[in-house]
Amino acid sequence: MINNFDQQIQYIPQFQQMQHQMQQQQQQQMQQQQQQQQQQQPQQMQIQLSTHEERLELASQSSPFEEKVTLNGLQKNIKVVIKNSPFNVQLRLKKANEIDLNCVAFESTLLYDCDTNEEKEVDFVKVKPVEHKASPNETGELVNIELRIKVLTSQHEDMFFRVKIEGQDPISKEPIKGLYALTHSIKVISKPEQLKKKQPPKKRTWNDILLESVSKIQHQQHEQQKLIEKLLQQQAGLSGSTSTTNNNNTTTTTTTTSSNNITSSSAINLPSPPSSTSSSPSSSPSSSPTLVNSHLLTSTLNNTSSNNLNSSSNTLNNNNNNNNNNSNTSTSNNNNCNINNNNNNNNNNNNNNISGFEDSFKQMMNAYTQLDPRQRAEKVRRVFRNASSRDSETLSELLDLFITEGVGGQLGTAVAPLPNSPPRLSNSSTQIQNSNNNNNNNNNNNNNNNNNNNNSNNNNSTNNNNNNNNNNNNNSTIPNNPFMSSHSNNGDPYPFFSNNSFDNDSFNSFGGSSNSEFIPF
């Protein structure tokens, strides 16, 4: 027994040594494992040794819409998102190169947006109300997180939400202290059409309506006042120019008596456009009848200057030529008012009696007669083809009036007799008579001047004789107007239409003798 006990005592140190060796081996294995873990994940040790300071901040947050809401006297910008639609949030480190975000796992939590700093999580049963997908950049300083919220604001008593994003240890899933960030306030809706609905406009009060209408009326009155002032200024400028031109016209001498009588007598057969004596003379070129009158004046003055006149008559003719040139630039016979009041009234009455329609009609007839007979039909046909509907109606009405006034039946046949009517003088015949009376009055005035001035010198008598000769020459050299001479019968009530038949060959109205070429309206 003693021997066995001694043997056991001998084995005790060996057993202790074995235990010590086994412990050392276990410690070595533990150290090796720790070294391997440190080699594989060196950043994990740094994360565990981190402090409690906030390391993440919100860089940006996207949303389809935004709203401004005032809660408890504070105005907030609410990010409006659509349920189950993704929106992005970017987070970055406050201190660069502190942690590599590529080695961090992120977790998202949906919280209520409370006025207090209390973090109250949104309850759920199985499905989390928020999902996320993190995408760090290459440097590990910035991370882009895509979020989706699966609950509505209306389902939670119209409360707004906030999302908390927190960094965790990828192995132990423990949160890293200070590595988190909160998003802005979020409102979740079901459809985007909810935001596009227009709010019903407020009803306008009567005061607003009245104020708006009064402002419009005031603006219109202001614009009208501006227009009236502008028109008054233009009228004042025209009246000033008219007074100056009238003063220049009144300075003409009585030596232009014969030249003015020439223009008045020549204007009988070739009428000029009517104008009032108060109108200002225009600086534009005169019309065609006035140009014809000027040609007649130059021809008659050249004929009289070819006679054997003394030096005083030549001076008188030069003065008459200058005065006639001035009278051609005027629009009315203003110079006659400075010679004789009676002659001025008669001439103005004669000019005013000539209507614009008769002048235009005579010009049309004159232009038609000047056409080549072979081209008349084509010209008239072209005019009717190019005429508008309104022009065609006007021409049809004009043709009806011609037929009513006596141009009845087919063209080229005898015209039906006109109904009996009291004889009346036409405007052209009265104009000729008035012009002859004016010439007689001028001649009588010249004869009276010659009788009263018997004691004058030979130059004055020569001038008076030249004036009488000029009047006689002008009366003899005035060409006969075919529209006046052929219808000068004072007893005919319709001087432009006679009872005699007319032939298409001589008066080729529409360019042919057959009725088939007549162009209907």
Swiss-Prot record:
One GO MF term: sequence-specific DNA binding
Region (Disordered): 238-357, 413-491
Domain of life: Eukaryota
GO cellular component: nucleus
Keywords linked to the UniProt accession: Coiled coil
Residue ranges with Low complexity bias: 238-266, 275-353, 423-482
InterPro entries in the cross-refs: CudA-like
Coiled-coil features, chain-numbered ranges: 14-41
Record's protein name: Uncharacterized protein DDB_G0286447
